[in-house]
């Protein structure tokens, strides 16, 4: 079986969010299952220079962008048993950020068609083309509407994964012709039209043979108006080919027993290193070094979606009622960045914030934390809680999306559960759950069992990769759609 991953970002090359982690880890796991997996992505100037120097030009192709024709270089790099092809176009991809440019519609129209042209240039006859989020949704659409008419592409199946439905790639209707090179018949409600514009995410959904989301609960949520982002009708029409497959993390990369970024290593059986890491991070941030004070952390974008408005409502109360410390790492909305700067000043022995992102520091924080707070308004899957489980930072989460699928509430009567959860997006429900978690922290023997359950929870890609393998196989064979 041959599978092509078409992605807009991928670790270890470039990353802006969780999509890059999936693109970096899942192909490796599929390769271990004997699937020939190739990844295609843009050759951004943001990729480290030493990595770009190792790329080898292997082919080139011409790509239609509306009425124009653009040159595309194709460069190859082998990494961790996976072949990566980087599609090169200096004007589109030599930018100071991955996204957020005035011509993103054109950039990813080019990339989507370039992916299909590059397949032919490389003579790579993929059985399945697997695309991700709006940036590559037009790959699925162009394959179905145009390229499958050519013998080289006619047997190829396509899968489209929704990582976050909130970001859809919406552009003026002129893009149908001027960027995608399609005629106006594609601007209908049954095709690309979306409230007077065109929608790349919608195109990927309607054209793919299979659509997946990054958790089973998120799959069900996006069929409702609350989570559906005005695409719930389109998704409902596709629900027989809509599957939720839970993301994992790279458990070799995220391993407290071997992580080069942390000061002391440990595992689920011997957690003495975790205690030492806590003292290191308390000292680093200028907090009182005290093992008996529970340390809570948040590593996230500082946005309302991540629940920071809930934090803002009750953090004062928590500091007044509980002996606890909080470390926050992230950037985001100015309202929350300024709030945590104020809280650092108001509670210098309780609250510290690093406004920015620093991967090695984030690992140190996970390894030091007793609790990890993630009260998201919605969360398609979530990466933070998976890393937290792996590092023994017991998650406190809202029951939504992938948080619901990965964190189970601790039950005192049975000893089951790997974290603490609350259902409603409500500040005082969150506060009550945090206080409950803190009460168990001081019962050392019981707390040790909770931490061990967290650390032994399987967060790897192994099971999910087998589910994708099954999905691909069933689609290639033309069998029933939804995985049961």
From Swiss-Prot:
Its EC number is 2.4.1.21. GO terms for biological process: glycogen biosynthetic process. It catalyses: [(1->4)-alpha-D-glucosyl](n) + ADP-alpha-D-glucose = [(1->4)-alpha-D-glucosyl](n+1) + ADP + H(+). GO terms for molecular function: alpha-1,4-glucan glucosyltransferase (ADP-glucose donor) activity; alpha-1,4-glucan glucosyltransferase (UDP-glucose donor) activity. Keywords: Glycogen biosynthesis, Glycosyltransferase, Transferase. ADP-alpha-D-glucose binds at residue 15. Transmembrane segments: none annotated. InterPro entries: Glyco_trans_1, GS/SS, Starch_synth_cat_dom. Pfam families: Glyco_transf_5, Glycos_transf_1. Pathway: Glycan biosynthesis; glycogen biosynthesis. The keyword Transferase applies. Synthesizes alpha-1,4-glucan chains using ADP-glucose. PANTHER family: ALPHA AMYLASE DOMAIN-CONTAINING PROTEIN, GRANULE-BOUND STARCH SYNTHASE 1, CHLOROPLASTIC/AMYLOPLASTIC. Belongs to the glycosyltransferase 1 family. Bacterial/plant glycogen synthase subfamily. This is Glycogen synthase. It comes from Bacillus licheniformis (strain ATCC 14580 / DSM 13 / JCM 2505 / CCUG 7422 / NBRC 12200 / NCIMB 9375 / NCTC 10341 / NRRL NRS-1264 / Gibson 46). The gene is glgA.
